[in-house]
Amino acid sequence: AVGSFRQEDVEFPKAWSQNATNIVAQKYFRGQLNSPTRERSVKQMVSRVSGTIADWGRERGYFASVEDGGAFEAELTYILLHQMAAFNSPVWFNVGFEEQPQCSACFILSVEDTMESILDWNTKEGKIFRGGSGSGINLSNIRGSMEHLKKGGTASGPVSFMRGADSWAGTIKSGGKTRRAAKMVVLDIDHPDVLDFVWCKAREEEKALALRDAGFDMSIDGDGFTSIQYQNANNSVRVTDEFMERAERGEEWELKARVDDAANELVDAKDLLNQLADAAWRCADPGVQYHTTINEWHTCPVSGRINASNPCSEYMHVDDSACNLASLNLMKFRRADGSFDVDAFQHAVEVVILAE
């Protein structure tokens, strides 16, 4: 049993830890709890995944022979069952269960400065969360809150639209499971609303403290906490070498309007950097992404600029792309004498990459 979750008569390898058992039974076994179709054994779960992937390979002609396909399936099953490697959660959630499974855990989206594009961003994120994955996006194309609209008035600005996206993320459980949606929201350091972005979470944290002191339930699912905004995303400011150098020299920095040059503003670069650090000290957000360095290390520069990352930031790539993660457990390749089994590791890598 884990909290309110309980499933009887489950089957796990003796070598698996209690923690691994809890996680798999609660999050990765598919089928309605207490129904005959509910998975109850690791053998069922691993066979569902490895068998489906092997069948895809057979259908698409990946294997030279029937025997090769069978060998691949057996090796992948062995690797997964002995915890030598593991796929990202959407694979366990969806493969062999959904007709068209969402397998990638990490998505990077894009958005343009139109209402249609902004609404499309929210729709895409909702579908990504439903499939058990997370997404990142850079909102710097959206005009600032002081910029004009064609038909009069001023724009809402990206920080305002973040409220709606944050609410959707808080509502949609990732993959229909207990895992919450994961978001990364990025804004460039030269965006006119960058200070609102820097402080949006810190201001909400002040509200959280006031509600706590007033006696509200501020646990993660409590009524008080769920009323606090911007809590379902990691926020990061995208900084360039030029900005950091200007801050170091104590120079001014230009905030650039997206569509209206009249809205440009000069600010003290060092003060802006200090405010970013102050907000991060208060609430651990925003983080910093070093735009210049990231793009200098870009492995596919011809495909476009890197503007954002996935929520955990290990995946940095072009907009409208996705990544299917897997992890290998290096300790499983350590021999009794402390040496590393390079041949077994290389073979496991080949099998897992083919499966991916």
Model-derived segments and spans:
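Extended catalytic cores of very large enzyme megasubunits
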Residues: 1-356
